[in-house]
Amino acid sequence: GPRAVPTVDEHRVYTLGAAGMLSCFDTETGDLLWRVDTVTDYDATVPVQGTSQAPIVEENLLIAAVGGEPDAKVVAFNKVTGDEVWRSLDNISETGYSAPIIIDAGGARQLILWHATAITSLNPKTGEIYWNQDFTIGGGMAITTPVRSGRYLAVSQFFNGTMMMALNPDRPDARMLWKGRNRGELPDQTDSLHSIISTPIVVGDHLYGIGSYGELRGIDATNGERLWESDQMNEQDRWATAYFVRHRDRYFVVNDSGELILARFNPDGYEEIDRTRLLRPTTRTRGGISGRYRDRAVLWAHPAFANQHVVVRNDETVVRLSLASTDYQ
């Protein structure tokens, strides 16, 4: 089954499984419409933590980070038949775990793929490379989703920190504004934002997110300068995670303790409006692959928000809860 969020397009749902199986199902019946085994068909290398990138639909294409050979790090398929339309990028480095996104910038649609050695922009219709910025990261751990807001395009990583790109307004191109520096992974050894699973947010000229050990930080997006830090949102521990979803002038945040937090973020600090428990975490970190870190229970599944409800799950239960104030009067 998939670690990545399924992708729904009209009456089809697409999943990219943890072992590299790309499947298309009918949403009404659950019938399998087509399937591609990326390991068998593309000699794909499954990452240590399992394939985790959600595929993306663009017009008649389903685009997936495959990590295959030859030159098939990313592949576009006909979304109806599953036939290959194009492939692009050599696979000399790990593909990572970050889902591709599509943006409009510089007068063009751009497919943005962040992988273990670079962030790359491609033409989603053809796979042609528009631009490429080297960014070699530790452990192949490109996990968070690239974030675009206005001229900014940001990626953030546990060991290497954040890299901020400035998108060219006139053509499909970009330049690096800044990237983080660090002496290690601990909070007192990092300068900007070192996210691992939690995708940060960009609001105006500021970047906000959860760092390597649970520290919530506000960053000047123009130069990477840290403006403030708070330890109030998350438990302060390795691999801390929180998911941010914008709602009007504030954000819904679900942290890895299973709490829903209503908050605002601004250059002066973090404003918590309220919080409540949604679900108790049941997945355990087991101290990581090496087993040398503290074992704790975490909630790492991204919530879904729709129709004034939140849907959240652990590895035992799925719950839907109302967010409408009228339900609590």
What spans do the regions from the language model cover?
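Short loop/turn segments immediately following beta-strands, especially the blade-tip
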Residues: 28, 162-174, 219-223, 262-271, ...
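Loop/turn-rich, solvent-exposed surfaces of beta-rich toroidal or solenoidal domains
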Residues: 161-162, 185-269
